[in-house]
């Protein structure tokens, strides 16, 4: 059954999987589906072994007997989307038009720490509506609408992704609109849904812009992806150009959705490999370049180097990424911001323990993000999946800064609908 499923996935007209923003089946969806299949097949084998001789057994495969999982795969494939999870999508049909598929995600969490001045709080996570529409065999639409609250308890609505997609073949696919920049691995493998990821939150270096993140997580422009031909290494390329991140004042909206603050454009180039002989393994590198123009500082040349090595197979998750931001101030100095994280987890039935160590060090004299300074520490926790639709997570963390150290816990219920 798994061989048939994998063949169907590979036969679909996409230009790669989750690492290619907005194209094809989401890589995390496939891993979750295959993991669930393995678990169900194991349960069926145990039941067959325990059944008395002569007792009839059901011949259908466990994947086919699980309508939630099989429906998710069918819905995702027909929509040409990249972030559907292992649950049914909701179809909205209008006579004469292609059906629109809607998938929902959200979470509720609680956090407490011993940091002075920090208050333990319950909090609403992002309410995420993932929308896809297939216009033809080669054309599709993808939207991601998020409702969330900020630190001032104000609820707002933001269009996190909006893409018009053209897929010529496995070697070329082009998206136009607002996308998740393909810097490293995590940003295009895990989108706006905590349910998809093992831990409660994202790694420190991949925090969203409105949450204090230093990377240009979102961009508005063009993104091209595809597979390189004649390669047993499973090589894929990424080429993106967009407005880049706003930099004039800290109060500006970080994502330049409508107007660019200058005529220069941000460019991101990347390449990654998924060797055929090592299922679940991926390694890659990307280079991002932009010019920033903060008031009172002058032009800053920004270069972001990112590399990753990940392995996800048979319930094992091993993620490793290193990133260096280089800021060259015109007529001034050059500053480097190193950051990395390493995360490992292992699924054992419905339980997945995980551990992550993360690090970021912003120089004291760095002109843009010196308020962040040095931050590093471990995060360890446990994820328990109630079923294919809901999960509970409990994690403990230690946050170490230059002059402050704190300990705390986070707990979360995340779900898809």
Model-derived regions, located:
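Sec-dependent N-terminal signal peptides
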Residues: 4-13
């Amino acid at each position: 059954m798994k061989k048939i499923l994998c063949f169907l996935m590979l036969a679909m007209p996409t230009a790669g999987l989750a690492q290619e923003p907005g194209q094809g089946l989401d890589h995390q969806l496939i891993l979750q589906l295959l993991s669930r299949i393995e678990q169900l097949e194991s349960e069926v084998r145990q039941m067959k072994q325990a059944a008395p001789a002569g007792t009839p057994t059901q011949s259908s495969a466990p994947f086919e007997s699980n309508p939630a999982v099989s429906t998710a795969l069918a819905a995702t494939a027909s929509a040409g989307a990249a972030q559907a999870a292992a649950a049914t999508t909701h179809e909205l049909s209008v006579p004469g038009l292609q059906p629109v598929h809607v998938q929902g995600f959200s979470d509720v969490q609680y956090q407490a720490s011993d940091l002075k001045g920090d208050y333990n709080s319950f909090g609403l996570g992002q309410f995420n509506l993932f929308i896809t529409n297939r216009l033809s065999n080669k054309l599709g639409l993808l939207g991601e609408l998020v409702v969330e609250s900020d630190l001032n308890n104000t609820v707002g609505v933001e269009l996190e992704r909006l893409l018009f997609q053209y897929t010529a073949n496995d070697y070329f696919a082009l998206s136009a609109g607002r996308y998740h920049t393909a810097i490293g691995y995590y940003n295009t493998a895990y989108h706006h849904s905590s349910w998809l990821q093992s831990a409660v939150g994202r790694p420190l270096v991949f925090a969203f812009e409105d949450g204090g993140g230093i990377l240009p997580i979102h961009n508005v422009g063009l993104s091209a992806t595809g597979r390189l031909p004649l390669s047993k290494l499973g090589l894929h390329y990424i080429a993106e150009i967009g407005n880049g991140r706003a930099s004039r004042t800290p109060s500006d909206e970080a994502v330049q959705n409508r107007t660019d603050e200058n005529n220069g454009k941000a460019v991101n180039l990347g390449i990654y490999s998924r060797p055929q002989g090592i299922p679940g393994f991926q390694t890659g590198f990307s280079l991002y370049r932009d010019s920033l123009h903060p008031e009172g500082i002058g032009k800053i040349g920004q270069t972001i180097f990112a590399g990753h090595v990940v392995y996800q197979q048979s319930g094992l998750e091993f993620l490793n990424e290193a990133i260096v931001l280089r800021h060259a101030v015109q007529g001034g100095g050059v500053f480097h911001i190193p950051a990395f994280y390493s995360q490992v987890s292992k699924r054992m039935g419905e339980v997945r323990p995980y551990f992550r160590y993360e690090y970021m060090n912003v120089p004291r004299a760095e002109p843009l993000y010196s308020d962040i300074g040095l931050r590093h520490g471990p995060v360890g926790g446990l994820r328990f999946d109630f079923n294919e639709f809901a999960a509970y997570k409990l994690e403990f963390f230690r946050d170490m800064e230059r002059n402050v150290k704190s300990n705390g816990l986070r707990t979360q219920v995340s779900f898809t609908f």
